[in-house]
Amino acid sequence: MVASALCRLFLLLILPLALNAQDFLEWRSLPSLPEPLGVAGPFVAGDGSRLLVAGGAHFEVSPFLGGTKQWISRAWLYDGEQDAWTAAESLPGPRAYGASVAISDGAIWIGGSDAERHYAAVVRVRLDGQELIYEDLPPLPEPVANHAAVLFGSTVYVAGGQAAPDSTEAYRRFWALDVDDDSPRWREVEAWPGPGRILPVMVALDDGVYVASGAELLPDAEGGATRRFLTDAYRYHPDAGWNAVADSPRPLVAAPATAWGGEHLFVFGGDDGSLFFDAPALGEDHPGFTHEVLDYHSVTDTWTPRGESPFSHVTTTAIPWQDGVLIASGEDRPGHRSPAVFLGTAASRSARFRPLDYVALVVYLGALVGIGFYFSRGSATTEDFFLAGRRTPWWAAGLSIYGTQLSSISFIAIPAKVYSTDWVNLLVQLSIVLAAFPVVWLYLPHFRRTKMTSAYEYLDTRFNASVRLFASASFVLFQLGRMAIVLYLPAIALSTVTGIDILAAILVMGVLATLYTALGGIEAVIWTDVVQVVVLLGGAAVALIVALWNLDGGVSGLFVQAAAAEKLHVFNWTWDYTTAAVWVVLVGNLFNNLIPYTSDQAVVQRYLTTRTEKEAARGIWLNAALLPVSTLILFSLGTALWAFYRQQPESLIPGQPMDSIFPLFIAQQLPAGVAGALIAAVFAASMSTLDSSLNSVATALTKDWYERFRPAASDARKLRLARGLTVGLGAVATGISLSLATFDVGSLWDTSQAVMGLLGGGLAGLFALGIFTRRANARGALIGAVASAFVLAWVQRATEVHLFLYGLVGIGTCFVVGYAASLLVSPKSAH
C-alpha cells in the first residue's frame, strides 16, 4: 500500500502536465430580455458595458398550432453596471434576420426582412452616453436577409442570404464596403467556390474571413424551397482570394459564432439538419437544437468539440462583451424563441508547475547567480569588468555572441512563426552566415587593431567626438527599450501556460540578471551565456524528439503531413520587393544582420574580450557555424508542434498568444524537472539578452560619456560607477517592464520603440562610412544618419517595401547621403 502511494506520488511529480477536460467556457445568465416570448433574428449592438437588442421576430401562437410569425420593432437597452434592461428607441419599422457587425462603439446593421419583403438598408448605430445615434450608410446593391457579415480590417463583408421571402435560390454573392473610405460604396467581390447559401457561419480571424456551413436552397415539388445542409468551409483574404479549409464535422446552420483570439473560431450550437424535415411531425415535442460548442483552429485547420453551452439558440448574433462573448435571445427550437441572455468567459486552463519543475527552476537560476559570485573575484579593474581581461577563450566568446543574439523572444518566436506559417524565414537565419564574412574580413580589424573598449571609440578616431556621442546615445536609448521588452514578452508567454505570475516572472529575471552582471561583469555574462546556449539548444532538441515521438507516423509522417499542407515551403521566386522573395530575404537580412554585428556594443564587445584578433574571428565563425544547426532544430520543432497540435487540437488553449505555443508544449508534454529546466532556460535566455545589454550600456556610458567629462577619474571610481550603472539600468528596465505588464501603455511604448528603431540603420551606416570611404567627414556622417531615420520612416509609412529591406534602406541612405554631404560640407575634416 505504501509502495503504491509512493508510486502514485512519483508519477504525479514526473508525468507531463495535463489540462483538465472541463468545458473551455464558463457561462452565467444575465437578466432576460424584457420581450417575454424572446426574438429570433434581432439586431444587436454593444460597447462592452451596454447591449442594444432591436427588432426580431417570434410566434405569439406556435406555428404547429396555426400561429403566424410576427415581426417587431421594439428595442431594449441593457446596462451592465445597473444589470437591468430599459426600453430604447424603436426601429422605424418591424425588421429581423439582418446581419449585425460589431464595431468598437456599436454595430453596423445590414439588410433584413419583414413579413412582406427583404431590405438593402445599411445603418451604423452608436451608443453615445444615453443616446443612440443612427447613421445611414450606402445600401446594398440588392435586398437580402438570412445572410452573414463581418468586419475584417476596415472592410465589412457580406455573404449569402436570399433576395426575397419566397426565393428558391440562395445568393452566391460576396459584397464589400470599406467603412473608412471618405465615400464608401459597395463592391462585389469574387464569391467562394461552393454553392450559394443562407444562414452561414461567418467570422474574421487574423488570417482572413471564414465562411462555413449554411443551407443551400433548392426548389421543391410544390414550387417552394427546401434546404440542403452544408458543411463546406472557406477562407478569404483580400490578397490571396479564396481557399477551402476543413469541412465542419456537422452542419452549423444559423449558429451564433465568434472569434476567440486571432486563430480560434467558436461556434455555439446551430441547426445540424438532423430533425429539420421531421419538425412538423414533432411539433412542440421537438427537443431543440444542439448545445455542442465547436472550436475551429485556423493554424492546424482542425475542428474540436469544446463541451456544451447551456443554450441552444440559433438565428442570433454572438457579440464580444468585455472579456467574453454574449448571446442574447434567439430561437431554441422550431417555432419557439427564448428571452434568455448568456455571457461566456474563458475558464482557467493554464498548466501548472509541479514540485520538480520548481526545483529545477530554482537550481538553474541559483547556478547563474553563483557564476556571478564566482567571477566577481576577478573583476578588480574596468578592463576586467568590461572586457574580461581580454582572456576569454574564442569558443566561449562565440557561444556568447550566439546567446546574445538568440534572445528568449527568438527562442520562443522562431518555432511559433514556423508553427503558424512555413519555412520561408529559414533564409533569414542563414543570412547571418553571409554577414560573418564582411564582419571578419572588413570590420573586425578596425575594432581590434586599436585598443578600444567601446565600439564607438572608433567613430571618435575616424570622425570626431560628436559622432561618437550621437552613436553611443542612440545605442543606449535603444537598449533601454530592448531590455524591457525582452523581460516583458517572454513573461507573458510563460505566465499564460504555466500560471507563474507575470510580475513575479519579470522581477525574478530582472533582479537575478542585474545581480550577477553587477557582480561578475562581462565575464559572468559570457559564461552564463555559454551555459544557457547549451541548455537552450539541448532543450529544444529534447522537445523536438518528444514531439516526434508523440506523432502518429513519426518523422516520415511529419514530412508527409507538412508537405501536403505546404508547411515546408522555403523559396518565393519573384522580383516583388513587397514580399518575402528569396532576394529580399537574403539581401535584406544581410544588411539587417550587419546592424548588430557591426554597430551594437553588446556584440562588438565580445570581439574585444579574446586575446587576439584571430581568436575573435574564430568566435564569429563559431557563431556562424551554430546557426544552421540551431535553425534546423528550431524550424523542425515549429513544424513538429504544428503536426502535434493538428493531431491533438484539444490540447490547445484558445485565446493564448501565438508565441505561447512552445512554452505550452513544454509545460504539457515534457516530464517534471525537464519541463522546469527548459522553462528556466527560457527565463535564462531573457536574462542572457538583458545581462549583455546591462554590461554593454554601462560600458558605453562609462567609456563614451563619463571618461570624456571626467578624464582624471581613477579606475576604481570608474569600476564603482559601472557597477552602480548596472544596478540602476537593471532597475529601470525591470520597472519599465513591470509598467508594461500593469498599465495600458502599449501604444505609447510601441511608438517610442518604432522611433528608436529608425536609428539602427544609420548607426551601422556610420561605421560603413568610416571604414569604406576616405572623404566622409563628421558633419556629413551625422547628416547621413539623420537622413537615414527620416527616409526609413517615410518608407515604412508611405510604401509597401517589405520590412526585410529596412536595414538596406537605413544603411544605404546613411552611406549615400553621408558621403554626398561630406563632399559638400567641411571637406577639410575628411580623413
Describe each model-derived feature in a short phrase.
Residues 6-9, 48, 300, 831:
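Serine/proline-rich low-complexity intrinsically disordered segments, especially terminal tails, linkers
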Residues 349-831:
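Membrane-embedded helix-loop-helix hairpins and adjacent transmembrane boundary segments
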Residues 17-21, 810:
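Short, intrinsically disordered, charge-balanced linker/junction segments flanking boundaries
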Residues 14, 89-95, 104, 111-114, ...:
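Generic hydrophobic/packing signal
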Residues 22-353:
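Kelch-like beta-propeller repeat domains
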Residues 1-5:
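N-terminal secretory signal peptides that target proteins for export/translocation
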Residues 11, 26-29, 133-136, 153-154, ...:
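Residue-level detector of alpha-helical hydrophobic segments embedded in or interacting with membranes
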Residues 8-18:
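Bacterial N-terminal signal peptides
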